[in-house]
């Protein structure tokens, strides 16, 4: 370790709605070259652990095409732009997806979701003192809001029924 691996070429292979896929040519410390795939998530994302006054955690259930099934997750979404503060994103996604808002949102952690080949990050926040409003789902979203006890959520995680990394 210690010697650098250097990218000597980057070729855009696909440009999608929220991500770009590149083929990188990398020079290894031994002088050989290899091609590596790289996925650039253009905007980053935010998620929020929202806890009601009764101690229940707000979760969203939605269909995920990549898994071909519904998942149970904390509310989350991509930033509207690369300059949007992720705290703003978290607050917006909380209200859009759950129909709750909060003025008490604090930063928890920044997650790098797939460090081997992707630069996506998700900043996770904690929200309390929730106020009920209305869901404002995007046209393509079909989200059910559920309130869970933390112990029950932990049980689902240990049983492998919640597999979403940010959750």
Regions found by a protein language model. Give the residues of each.
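Short, solvent-exposed loop/turn elements at beta->coil junctions and helix N-caps
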Residues: 9-12, 110-114
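Short, well-ordered beta-strand micro-motif
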Residues: 23-25, 50, 126-128, 147-149
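Nudix hydrolase/Nudix homology domain
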Residues: 2-5, 32, 70, 107, ...
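The catalytic Nudix box helix
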Residues: 59, 74-107, 125, 137-140, ...
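Acidic, metal-coordinating catalytic segment for phosphate/diphosphate chemistry
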Residues: 10-47, 52-53
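Short beta-strand micro-motifs in enzyme catalytic cores
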Residues: 20-24, 34, 70, 121-123, ...
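Active-site-adjacent beta-strand/loop module that shapes the phosphate/pyrophosphate-binding cleft
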Residues: 25-30, 114-133
């Amino acid at each position: 370790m210690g010697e650098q691996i250097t990218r000597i070429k980057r070729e855009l292979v696909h440009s999608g709605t929220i991500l770009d896929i590149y083929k990188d040519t990398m020079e290894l410390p031994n002088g050989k070259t290899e091609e590596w795939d790289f996925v650039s998530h253009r905007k980053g994302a935010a998620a929020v652990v929202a806890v009601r006054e009764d101690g229940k955690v707000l979760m969203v259930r939605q269909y995920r095409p990549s898994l071909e099934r519904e998942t149970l997750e904390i509310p989350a979404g991509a930033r509207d732009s690369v300059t949007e503060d992720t705290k703003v994103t978290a607050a917006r996604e909380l209200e859009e997806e759950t129909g709750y808002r909060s003025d008490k949102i604090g930063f928890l952690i920044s997650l790098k979701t797939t460090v081997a080949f992707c630069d996506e990050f998700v900043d996770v926040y904690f929200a309390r003192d929730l106020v009920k409003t209305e869901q404002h789902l995007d046209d393509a979203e079909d989200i059910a809001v559920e309130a869970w006890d933390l112990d029950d959520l932990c049980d689902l995680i240990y049983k492998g029924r919640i597999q979403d990394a940010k959750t």
